[in-house]
Amino acid sequence: MRKKLIAGNWKSNGSLERNKALLEGIVNAKALGSVDVVVCPPFPYLQSVESAVSDSMIELGSQNCSATEDGAYTGEVSAKMCADMKCSWVILGHSERRALYAENDEVIACKVKRAVESGLAPILCVGETLADRESGRAEEVTLKQLDAVFMSVQPDDSWVVAYEPVWAIGTGKTASPEDAQSMHKALRNNIRKHFPQIADKIRILYGGSVKSSNAKELFSMPDVDGALVGGASLVSEEFVSIIEAAVE
């Protein structure tokens, strides 16, 4: 049985004061241990957040890493640097990175390779736009994004997939549990074609307006192994409720 994973993507939010209050409401959640929990703050807060969660069962993740190694790349943060900051995870391929910063499948595959080489576990985000879904291409587009990274990972690498339909991110809209399950099953079957030995072990998360009111129903689906949570991860009570829903 796959252990549920709940990852909080803070995006470009937070302050030292707000982060402290948020984490104080999460670190003692009773469900920690029964569920794997990751928080992914903005780069400037990695060190302070790591200090705040170091004695808890919460793991630290980065929201991104560079496709390059260390060197003359002004403004870039390498995977090695993230690992040096005690990150265990890194979010890659998020739709906001694809849309706002023109990251294509080739760039994302390179980032995945850098991440695993540095000992980070990628949370690979894939998902279709509303136009893709309405044209009947949702599965085609999503599986193509997954296909792009198979050359960057090995069966024994640690990584997870997060299905995030772009039309559901930050909109309040959520894919139905049945729609999520259908796509998660397709993703798992695609993994089976490349790495049959890990297809039933790898975790596939759902992301896209996940909140306490819909989490339990989503988690009841056989191929939904947790969530990548955006806005709701910024409210401790809401995030803890989602974590608890993953246990039930």
From Swiss-Prot:
Substrate binds at residues 9-11, 170, 209, 230-231. One of its GO terms (molecular function) is triose-phosphate isomerase activity. One of its GO terms (cellular component) is cytosol. It is an enzyme of class 5 (isomerase). It comes from Hahella chejuensis (strain KCTC 2396). This is Triosephosphate isomerase. Gene3D superfamilies: Aldolase class I. PROSITE patterns: TIM_1, TIM_2. The keyword Transport does not apply. Keywords: Cytoplasm, Gluconeogenesis, Glycolysis, Isomerase. Involved in the gluconeogenesis. Catalyzes stereospecifically the conversion of dihydroxyacetone phosphate (DHAP) to D-glyceraldehyde-3-phosphate (G3P). It is found in: Cytoplasm. SUPFAM superfamilies: Triosephosphate isomerase (TIM) (SSF51351). Homodimer. Belongs to the triosephosphate isomerase family. It catalyses: D-glyceraldehyde 3-phosphate = dihydroxyacetone phosphate. The active site is at residues 94, 164. The lineage of its organism: Bacteria, Pseudomonadati, Pseudomonadota, Gammaproteobacteria, Oceanospirillales. One of its GO terms (biological process) is glycerol catabolic process. Its EC number is 5.3.1.1. Pfam families: TIM (PF00121).
